[in-house]
Curated annotation (Swiss-Prot):
Keywords: Carbohydrate metabolism, Chloride, Hydrolase, Magnesium, Metal-binding. It comes from Shigella flexneri. Specifically catalyzes the dephosphorylation of 2-phosphoglycolate. Is involved in the dissimilation of the intracellular 2-phosphoglycolate formed during the DNA repair of 3'-phosphoglycolate ends, a major class of DNA lesions induced by oxidative stress. It catalyses: 2-phosphoglycolate + H2O = glycolate + phosphate. This is Phosphoglycolate phosphatase. The keyword Magnesium applies. HAMAP family: GPH_hydrolase_bact. Pathway: Organic acid metabolism; glycolate biosynthesis; glycolate from 2-phosphoglycolate: step 1/1. Belongs to the HAD-like hydrolase superfamily. CbbY/CbbZ/Gph/YieH family. The active site is at D13. GO terms for cellular component: cytosol. It comes from the Bacteria.
Length: 252
């Protein structure tokens, strides 16, 4: 029995699932930290902070940077720095700086993962409505989808500012299913992190976990999605479609 035979729509996470956004996110985080005269983190570290929205990203960045600064000063025999600005206010300032810098680098620092466009096109051609659910701040979402030429595939897009409760809360997924006019159990959700899988389970949606994204350094199988794939086009055969690589070879 095909686990996905009752699927009537598919929704996707964005960062780490459809796009590699780490270069742009890391650049904006580091520019914001540098502007506040704090240590910069680097892409490898920032990747472990991605997934819960920009506010949480800023909190994680600031916590790390303040600790790193204290460690560096102690190593150099310098006294600790007394922060005149409370941490909450620093997070607010950091977020404002991040938004400015990310607006400048988002498009050039974001790339489609392999087979994404072909997979979305094949699903749309089959007549399945497609949705997008991301914790990314809403103002950045539409311009990014347009720049990557994938906005045309989605009938429903939910950004991080469009709901009160972000993933892993089920609300964004339930909203997408409602707008698609289908039951949650008829909507497949595809993501790369535990937030995605937890949201899908809470909403009652079947889930696909992808192995290549951003998941806080842990394996996606620990979140127990219904199915695990190494490439996004691996979900096509499960939905009754030819694998996109096979389709490409037929077209050559």
């Amino acid at each position: 029995m095909n686990k996905f035979e009752d699927i009537r729509g598919v929704a996707f996470d964005l960062d780490g699932t459809l796009v590699d956004s780490a270069p742009g996110l890391a650049a904006a985080v580091d520019m914001a930290l540098y502007a506040l005269e704090l240590p910069v983190a680097g892409e490898e570290r920032v990747i472990t902070w991605i997934g819960n929205g920009a506010d949480v990203l800023m909190e994680r960045a600031l916590t790390w940077a303040r600790q790193e600064r204290a460690t560096l000063r102690k190593t150099m025999g310098k006294p600790p720095v007394d922060d005149d600005i409370p941490a909450e206010e620093q997070v607010r300032i950091l977020r404002k700086l991040f938004d400015r810098y990310y607006g400048e680098v988002a498009e050039e620092g974001t790339f489609l993962f392999p087979h994404v466009a072909d997979t979305l096109g094949a699903l749309q051609a089959k007549g399945l409505p497609l949705g997008l659910v991301t914790n990314k701040p809403t103002p950045f979402v539409a311009p990014l989808l347009e720049a990557l030429d994938i906005a045309k595939y989605f009938s429903v897009v939910i950004g991080g500012d469009d709901v009160q409760n972000k993933k892993p809360h089920p609300d964004p997924l339930l909203l997408v299913a409602e707008r698609m006019g289908i039951a949650p159990q008829q909507m497949l959700f595809v993501g790369d992190s535990r937030n995605d899988i937890q949201a899908a389970k809470a909403a009652g949606c079947p889930s696909v976990g992808l192995t290549y994204g951003y998941n806080y350094g842990e394996a996606i199988d620990l979140s127990q999605p219904d199915v695990i794939y190494q490439s996004i086009n691996d979900l096509l055969p499960a939905l009754g479609l030819p694998h996109s690589e096979n389709q490409e070879s037929k077209n050559d």
